Amino acid sequence: MMNENSNFIKTIMKNELENGVVDHILTRFPPEPNAYLHIGHARAIINNFELSEYFGGATNLRLDDTNPSKEGAEYVEAIINDIKWLGYTPKTVNYGSSYFEETYEKAVLLIKKGLAFVCDLTHEEMAAYRGDVVTPGKN
């Protein structure tokens, strides 16, 4: 499906395989299961699966189910069905929530090493630091 000269990403992947930077290609599709997929998701699915398959690799489905108040099994099932409908099968199906404990432990370790910190900014302060389309953020 992909043209030989279709994009720079494929060129980079090819070079990294040829130069031994990586020995295989494994991509992922990481949706948050809080709504049905849209055309942008379909494009991402096609890109990831086609690139990995072109190089003999695979694609994992990693469901970013880290906001349980907005997510549901209905959306998980719909996402898996949509991927199949597009003609693809993920190598594995993983859930972000499966790694909560490990993520927490690593965050604590980074904080203890002085490599991370707990942010105590309010929502408004954080928005001011980020800026927006017409206002630059601040340091």
Descriptions of predicted regions:
Residues 4-15, 71-139:
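Active-site neighborhoods of enzyme catalytic cores
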Residues 5-14, 18-80:
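N-terminal catalytic cores of NTP/NDP-binding nucleotidyl/phosphoryl-transfer enzymes
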